[in-house]
Amino acid sequence: DKLIGSCVWGAVNYTSDCNGECKRRGYKGGHCGSFANVNCWCET
């Protein structure tokens, strides 16, 4: 998967709609994962 940003408000590269942002970039979708769901990962 491709890390594009953070799912935490106020964090660097905050992404309000992780799934939508990933789709906009051409990925199949995305989800908030990793430790404590802080990162936005796009499905590659």
Swiss-Prot record:
GO biological process: defense response to fungus; innate immune response; killing of cells of another organism
Any one annotated GO CC term: extracellular region
Chief location bin: secreted
Keyword list, A-Z: Antimicrobial, Defensin, Disulfide bond, Fungicide, Immunity, Innate immunity, Secreted
Cysteine-cysteine disulfides: 7-32, 18-40, 22-42
Subcellular location: Secreted
InterPro entries assigned: Defensin_invertebrate/fungal, Scorpion_toxin-like_sf
Similarity comment: family membership: Belongs to the invertebrate defensin family. Type 2 subfamily.
Function field: This peptide has potent anti-fungal activity. Has no activity against Gram-negative and Gram-positive bacteria.
Name of this protein: Defensin heliomicin
Organism of origin: Heliothis virescens (Tobacco budworm moth)
